[in-house]
């Protein structure tokens, strides 16, 4: 195998596929390179995730063939090469990257050790989605996933497709994030769970282009995601997602507020800065909200925050404690310029409502 490719395109391709290694376990670090008359394909496959990307422009395939090598090492070597075109060639058990006045050598691995790119099994539910919207929906809920691996359901994002509606949900026991969008009628009714770690690895592959589309396919145990140049095969999380709907109160809120998002984010940013490292028991430090005609925000920590915010307030006075760290993540993902919050009492959840998004935050106990 011998190819000539621009360094920029090579590094970009390797950064795309490196996410397919080590998600949810210790996978062997293998990169498979396949060159033929249609271009060059780079592929990594792990236990839970496989990624492949194809480069068809600004390259020359001088000798078709295929080989495998260490992906991380290949990316390191490519990054060290001078700008411009790079020749990649295999000779016996060595893989050379060459440019003017520079040649670096890596090792070739055994192709038999490369796991196959797994196809879907069972009935396939296939739909096309706007790339920008799909990426933004995942981004807006991903922060609410549980970070550990011991609870696969809670560390996953739940996808629900109901004909012309797509909804994604994530929760971690302290917060819930829900994002919903209307799409063209699909005739599809399906749901699945995908680990947050998998979504984090593939999120950079989804174009941030409102004019482009992605194909999302749900199978029995796996999903596929396809763009113009990339293809992802990932494992679905088994089991059932939590019945999160029952966490939403079925009564009217004690008080509703509407406040400017930018102003509230600035205040909560200062409260998050004030957080002290937990001394024992990981007891969260609350930001105290005194809600009456205005909102008084108080936080004691590295610094003391004491601010009064103008807001539209409807309901009874309320004093409640909220984690500023959790609130900061919710405010960042909230898609509108004005935030509407519903409070159901000092010991009940707080619901952030919007046209296409909904977030829930559990309060922190405070002294009266």
Question: Where does each model-flagged region fall?
Answer:
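Structural preference for solvent-exposed beta-strand-turn elements
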Residues: 1-368
């Amino acid at each position: 195998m011998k190819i000539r490719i621009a360094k920029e395109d090579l590094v970009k391709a390797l950064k795309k596929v490196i996410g397919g290694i080590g998600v949810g376990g210790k996978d062997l670090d293998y990169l498979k390179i396949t060159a033929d008359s249609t271009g060059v394909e780079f592929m990594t496959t792990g236990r839970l995730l496989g990624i492949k990307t194809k480069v068809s422009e600004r390259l020359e395939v001088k000798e078709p063939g295929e080989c495998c090598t260490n992906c991380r090492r290949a990316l390191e070597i490519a990054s060290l090469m001078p700008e411009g075109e790079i020749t990649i060639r295999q000779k016996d058990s060595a893989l050379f990257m060459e440019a003017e006045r520079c040649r670096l050598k890596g090792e070739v691995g055994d192709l038999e050790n490369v796991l196959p790119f797994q196809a879907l099994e069972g009935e396939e539910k296939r739909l096309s989605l706007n790339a920008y919207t799909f990426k933004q929906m995942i981004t807006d809920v991903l922060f609410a996933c549980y970070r550990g691996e011991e609870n696969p359901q809670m560390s996953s994002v739940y996808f629900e497709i109901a004909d012309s509606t797509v909804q994604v949900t994530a929760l971690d026991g302290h917060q819930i994030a829900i994002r919903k969008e209307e799409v063209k009628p699909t005739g599809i009714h399906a749901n699945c769970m995908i680990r947050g770690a998998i979504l984090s690895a593939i999120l950079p592959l989804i174009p941030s282009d409102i004019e482009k589309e992605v194909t999302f396919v749900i199978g029995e145990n796996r999903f596929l995601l396809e763009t113009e140049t990339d293809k992802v095969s990932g494992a679905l999380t088994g089991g059932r997602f939590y019945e999160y709907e029952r966490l939403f109160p079925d009564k009217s809120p004690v008080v509703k507020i509407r406040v400017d998002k930018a102003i509230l984010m600035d205040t909560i940013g200062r409260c998050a800065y004030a957080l002290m490292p937990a001394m024992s028991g990981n007891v969260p430090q609350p930001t105290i909200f005194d809600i009456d005609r205005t909102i008084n925000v108080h936080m004691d920590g590295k610094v003391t925050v004491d601010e009064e915010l103008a807001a539209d307030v409807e309901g009874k006075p309320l004093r409640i404690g909220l984690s500023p760290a959790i609130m900061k993540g919710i405010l960042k993902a909230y898609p509108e310029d004005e935030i509407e919050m519903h409070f159901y009492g000092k010991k009940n959840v707080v619901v952030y409502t919007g046209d296409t998004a909904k977030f829930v935050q559990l309060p922190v106990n405070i002294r009266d």
